[in-house]
Amino acid sequence: MLSTSLPVCFLVIGAALCAPERMQNDPDPHDSTAQGSDNHSDHIAPLAKRSPHYDFGLGKRAYSYVSEYKRLPVYNFGLGKRSRPYSFGLGKRSVDEDQTNDDQQQIMNNDLDQAALAEFFDQYDDAGYEKRARPYSFGLGKRFADDDTSEEKRARAYDFGLGKRLPLYNFGLGKRARSYNFGLGKRLASKFNFGLGKRERDMHRFSFGLGKRSADDASTEDSDNYFDV
């Protein structure tokens, strides 16, 4: 009898010692009011938020601004984003053309007549020179037209280039200025027009030679064969 009661006593004492103790501040798990307060405390962040003086850093902004756009107005520049002073470049329109839609909408709202509307669209007929800013309208594939008299389209100081030369430099291969128009097959009409197959019409000092008659033997018919170059 005593031998069977001792193990039972040890089991009861061990279970009592291993049971978790409830602290004085711990709420009763069967209390409904305490359970509601625990659910409310779960929504409170365990750590306090950063002070407004230290809300900058990686991924942190100095101010909170919720917008539906991708970038803030102060950060609208970057790759593929240019502000209005930098809207020119390759494939970028000038500032004046960017404001075309706004001006057109304003005219539509004012209900102007058809004549004023047609005059407005005539200002933007030529879209070639509007692609770039006016000081940068020259380049590869962009040349100043000879028949174009508008100084606003292209700068006249840059109208030369590949295949385009100023009047001062319009000589070259097959092109010679009037003071340099002599050469192979090109002679001046005055004192340098003699040579291979070329003779002076007035001066007969160089009309003799192998197979060449002198000036005394030359007839009037032969003189008609000569012509000025």
From Swiss-Prot:
This is Allatostatin-A. Allatostatin-A-1: Expressed in antennal lobe (AL), corpora cardiaca (CC), corpora allata (CA) and gnathal ganglion (GNG) (at protein level). Expression in AL and GNG detected in most animals, in CC and CA in some animals (at protein level). Allatostatin-A-3: Expressed in antennal lobe (AL), corpora cardiaca (CC), corpora allata (CA) and gnathal ganglion (GNG) (at protein level). Expression in AL detected in all animals, in GNG, CC and CA in most animals (at protein level). Residues 19-48, 62-80, 94-130, 144-152, 214-229 form a propeptide. InterPro entries: Allatostatin. Residues 1-18 form the signal peptide. The keyword tRNA processing does not apply. Neuropeptide inhibitors of juvenile hormone synthesis and gut muscle contraction. It comes from Agrotis ipsilon. It comes from the Eukaryota.
